[in-house]
Amino acid sequence: MNKQIFVLYFNIFLIFLGIGLVIPVLPVYLKDLGLTGSDLGLLVAAFALSQMIISPFGGTLADKLGKKLIICIGLILFSVSEFMFAVGHNFSVLMLSRVIGGMSAGMVMPGVTGLIADISPSHQKAKNFGYMSAIINSGFILGPGIGGFMAEVSHRMPFYFAGALGILAFIMSIVLIHDPKKSTTSGFQKLEPQLLTKINWKVFITPVILTLVLSLGLSAFETLYSLYTADKVNYSPKDISIAITGGGIFGALFQIYFFDKFMKYFSELTFIAWSLLYSVVVLILLVFANGYWSIMLISFVVFIGFDMIRPAITNYFSNIAGERQGFAGGLNSTFTSMGNFIGPLIAGALFDVHIEAPIYMAIGVSLAGVVIVLIEKQHRAKLKEQNM
């Protein structure tokens, strides 16, 4: 594997490992500092909101100043965020840590996505994005496990560990990452508003809407999953860990071994539509499942559809972006963060109304995504006929 690709994958893995580390440790912080569930919600939302605001600037600056520089700045911010959380003893410090962490993700994500697109041959781009999505998934899987294990020693240890990894990733990036000779900055040599008018914004409307809608539905489901299974079939933390880990492993395997093969036979939009329909069917089965093993088995396969959609959308963004890979990566990260910010807030309120309501929400959002894809496919077909 190309050394640069390996380092980029490591950086992405680090960011999402750091996000996952927080999950088992935050309740301990809440108890120590006397914080409430609302405070926990604010800490989670602060990260997503910060990433959402910073991502478009991170993407544009990556195109202008170089993706390596933006990635390195993001990694330094990541380490600062983790060390702040490790030493924090009041809510204000923890909140500032999460804001800085969101800024870090908002710089690293578009920088890495754009650089992978730049250095990947066209025939390997879909495969490399599939690997990237699998690595993101792996970070989410391993993060809570590592965080929970280290918390047995000290609930602050996971954050020191993540901060140290950030420094290591920064050093590796300085030494091993090089911006490609061919620049993808045309139109962004100066950060002037009128230059944005040169972008064909209509091209990005459908992927932006899809990204927002799908991240909203997916985050709503994933955020409430542990509470849902605990209330429905009395899953213990161990059961939930097995279900999430199993689902994550299956999702990662499909991304690594099957995603690029599917991309040879389907367009991104067609593949996204079929993945959404698969997810709808599995979510409906989850609603009707009431036994321990039936829900466990469904949990192993429920994430496959969502995990296949992520790299498909990333690849779709890349293919329509042309020489604006950093800009497209910034848009992708921005609207993913927006969905990750809004989804859990809505799902939490719905869960208080009815235990199945967040699942219904995810089903409705997935069906809406299918409709959006079909409308876009018809629109493209008409444009193709007009150009013939």
UniProtKB/Swiss-Prot annotation:
Keywords recorded for this protein, A-Z: Cell membrane, Membrane, Transmembrane, Transmembrane helix, Transport
Pfam families: MFS_1 (PF07690)
SUPFAM superfamilies: MFS general substrate transporter
Cellular location(s): Cell membrane
Membrane topology reported for the UniProt record: Multi-pass membrane protein
Highest taxon in the source lineage: Bacteria
GO cellular component: plasma membrane
First-listed, main subcellular location of the protein, grouped into a coarse class: membrane
Cited function: Involved in quinolone resistance. May constitute a membrane-associated active efflux pump of hydrophilic quinolones.
Name of the protein in question: Quinolone resistance protein NorA
Species: Staphylococcus aureus (strain MSSA476)
Lineage: Bacteria, Bacillati, Bacillota, Bacilli, Bacillales
